């Protein structure tokens, strides 16, 4: 949520800021702005809406070598130009951008800023006024004023600050909100995400919580809040420019759906050797072996991926698995087993709710594993272990390939642990072969795009409500499928256990209500789900069936290639991703950037 870009040095700041903000669009935002300094000429431009709206307001005179930019996701105050970042101090000397939530901003306003007039309603504007006060009224240096403000501010933040009287320096600080330093020759940068700067550099430096950084064109100074200088190594970001472009695709989501066979094969090559043996960190395997219960913590699609993997993990490892909504566990952690193991699923590795749980786990001495798509992310740094998805950047807000990669990665992990335990099911499960078949199954489904699009047009083009139903693993797929549909088509959709229809939900079925039935697993389960489908059809529902090969009957709508039952949640989810995509497309919506949603939820 939100994005920060900043640059100081021998570069065209305006171009870098705008290109960086465009690369951060996927994070979600409702307004944007930039500040650029060129000697005594200062330019501040802000806009509500898309980056294109901001670009249209920027004239050729908005140029300079130092600047900061921001995409805002409204938390305090509505989406207005006044509330858009960057914000300025009372005298306009200081300019600030901020991601996060300042929890004590009202107390700061009352205690320190009586008599100050504000242009908007944001917590950020109060922070920059406070810094300005400490310099211009209390006589502190800029660095001391910034440190003083940081000692007062409570909550999550990533700050980038410019003093217009010394615009060759950017002051940076973070706490519980992602921020990176990008390193160049004759210039340095700050950004929320490496993708924002990958055109300019591949060299980055991490900033840890409660650290302050002073950036000039030739230097990067890292300090703790006591002013002690810290040493920090840089690292090379493994990103390719081709990975973050759409190519010939109209939307990132369709590109990412199509990339899933490649992702499956990438995971095979990463987590198995040439003989087909599992190549998982032995320390991770040993830690899970020693656990008496696995707790999977996640949010959104990652939470659904955890559910889709639960039965597989239990059957392969003989270890009970519990799922937890990270945002709830952060405040109300239940009674745990004697030897718990936490697995945190997060595409971005920056999910604030999951991090809150991880902080508690670390305090309690509970071992943890982060399964993420982003190396060097906060969750990967702070967990005991990390397992990467190797899915490549996922730009579309609605997650697709990260979901299937999470299920596949957990399959590799489960097989490795099961083999170490001598579990027969794990020893006999040829995961490399079976996942190769999954990749082929995905390709077969992707070849049926026209069929799926035509089914969607008949069923979902004008509806306001829809339901997915399934049993067993199909129920877990139904949860993810319904989330995907509601995210990008704005159709009120729910995924239900088919057997629960009679316990209340069937009262919502009326003439024309779309119901999508998912059928895989055994003949018995399939028969029961078909019975539920008949029940809703008898009450006027418009039914679409997605069926695994071998369980299909004449009249079924979409047939998916049969794969191993442990991996069926991957094969069955692919048509539902396409259903969501075409429903959004046919409604004329922005598939990649649905309203009110952010790719990385970095505030609690």
From Swiss-Prot:
Domain Glutamine amidotransferase type-2: 2-218
UniProt cross-references to Pfam families, sorted A to Z: GATase_6 (PF13522), SIS (PF01380)
The keyword ATP-binding is annotated on this UniProt entry: no
Localisation: Cytoplasm
Listed EC numbers: 2.6.1.16
Active site feature: 2, 599
UniProt cross-references to InterPro entries, sorted A to Z: GATase_2_dom (IPR017932), GFAT (IPR005855), GFAT_N (IPR047084), GlmS/AgaS_SIS (IPR035466), GlmS/FrlB_SIS (IPR035490), Ntn_hydrolases_N (IPR029055), SIS_dom (IPR001347), SIS_dom_sf (IPR046348)
Keyword Protein biosynthesis found: no
Gene Ontology terms describing biological process: carbohydrate metabolic process; fructose 6-phosphate metabolic process; protein N-linked glycosylation; UDP-N-acetylglucosamine metabolic process
Catalytically driven reaction(s): D-fructose 6-phosphate + L-glutamine = D-glucosamine 6-phosphate + L-glutamate
Gene Ontology cellular-component annotations: cytosol
Superkingdom as given in the UniProt entry: Bacteria
Keywords: Aminotransferase, Cytoplasm, Glutamine amidotransferase, Repeat, Transferase
Self-association and partners: Homodimer.
Function noted in UniProt: Catalyzes the first step in hexosamine metabolism, converting fructose-6P into glucosamine-6P using glutamine as a nitrogen source.
Protein name: Glutamine--fructose-6-phosphate aminotransferase [isomerizing]
Protein species of origin: Streptococcus pyogenes serotype M6 (strain ATCC BAA-946 / MGAS10394)
């Amino acid at each position: 949520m939100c994005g920060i870009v900043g640059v100081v040095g021998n570069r065209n700041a305006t171009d870098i800021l705008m290109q960086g903000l465009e690369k951060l669009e996927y994070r979600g935002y409702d307004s944007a702005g930039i500040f650029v300094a060129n000697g005594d000429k200062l330019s501040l431009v802000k806009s509500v809406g898309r980056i294109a709206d901001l670009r249209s307001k920027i004239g050729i005179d908005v140029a300079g070598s130092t600047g900061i930019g921001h995409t805002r996701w409204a938390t305090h105050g509505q989406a207005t130009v006044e509330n858009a970042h960057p914000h300025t101090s009372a005298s306009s000397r200081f300019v600030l951008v901020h991601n996060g939530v300042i929890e004590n901003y009202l107390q700061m306003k009352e205690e320190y800023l009586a008599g100050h007039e504000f242009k908007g309603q944001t917590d950020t504007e109060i922070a920059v006024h406070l810094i300005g006060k400490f310099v211009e009224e209390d006589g502190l240096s800029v660095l001391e004023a910034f440190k003083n403000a940081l000692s007062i501010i409570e909550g999550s933040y990533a700050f980038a600050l410019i003093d217009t009287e010394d615009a060759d320096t950017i002051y940076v600080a973070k706490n519980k909100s992602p921020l990176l330093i990008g390193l160049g020759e004759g210039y340095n940068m700050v950004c929320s995400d490496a993708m924002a700067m990958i055109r300019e550099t591949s060299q980055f430096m991490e900033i840890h919580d409660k650290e302050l950084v002073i950036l000039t064109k030739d230097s990067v100074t890292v300090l703790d809040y006591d002013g002690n200088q810290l040493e920090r190594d840089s690292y090379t970001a493994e990103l390719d420019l081709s990975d973050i472009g759409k190519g010939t695709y109209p939307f990132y989501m369709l590109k990412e759906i199509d990339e899933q066979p490649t992702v499956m094969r990438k995971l095979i090559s990463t987590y198995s050797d040439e003989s087909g043996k599992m190549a998982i960190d032995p320390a991770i395997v040993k830690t899970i072996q020693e656990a008496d219960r696995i707790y999977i913590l996640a949010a959104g699609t990652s939470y659904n991926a955890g559910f889709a993997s639960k039965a597989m993990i239990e059957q392969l490892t003989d270890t009970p698995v519990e799922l937890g909504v990270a945002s709830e566990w952060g405040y109300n952690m239940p009674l745990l087993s004697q030897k718990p193991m936490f697995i945190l699923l997060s595409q971005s590795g920056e999910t604030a709710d999951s991090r809150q749980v991880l902080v508690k786990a670390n305090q309690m001495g509970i071992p943890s594993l982060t399964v993420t798509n982003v190396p060097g992310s906060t969750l990967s740094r702070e967990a005991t272990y990390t397992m990467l998805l190797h899915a490549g950047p996922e730009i579309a807000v609605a997650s697709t390939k990260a979901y299937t990669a999470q299920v596949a990665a957990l399959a590799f992990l489960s097989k490795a642990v099961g083999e170490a335990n001598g579990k027969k099911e794990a020893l006999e499960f040829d995961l490399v072969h079976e996942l190769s078949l999954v990749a082929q199954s995905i390709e077969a489904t992707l070849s049926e795009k026209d069929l799926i699009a035509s089914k969607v047009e008949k069923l979902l083009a004008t509806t306001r409500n829809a339901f997915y139903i399934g049993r067993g693993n199909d129920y877990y797929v139904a949860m993810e499928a319904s989330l995907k549909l509601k995210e990008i088509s704005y159709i009120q959709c729910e995924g239900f256990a088919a057997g629960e229809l009679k316990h209340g939900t069937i009262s919502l079925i009326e003439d024309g209500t779309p119901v999508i039935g998912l059928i895989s697993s055994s003949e018995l389960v399939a028969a029961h789900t078909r019975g539920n489908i008949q029940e809703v059809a008898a009450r006027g529902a418009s039914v679409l069936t997605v069926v695994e090969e071998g369980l299909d009957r004449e009249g079924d709508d979409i047939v998916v290639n049969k794969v191993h039952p442990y991996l069926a949640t991957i094969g069955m989810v692919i048509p539902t991703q396409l259903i969501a995509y075409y429903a959004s497309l046919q409604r004329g919506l922005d598939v990649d950037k649905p309203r009110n949603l952010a790719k990385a939820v970095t505030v609690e």
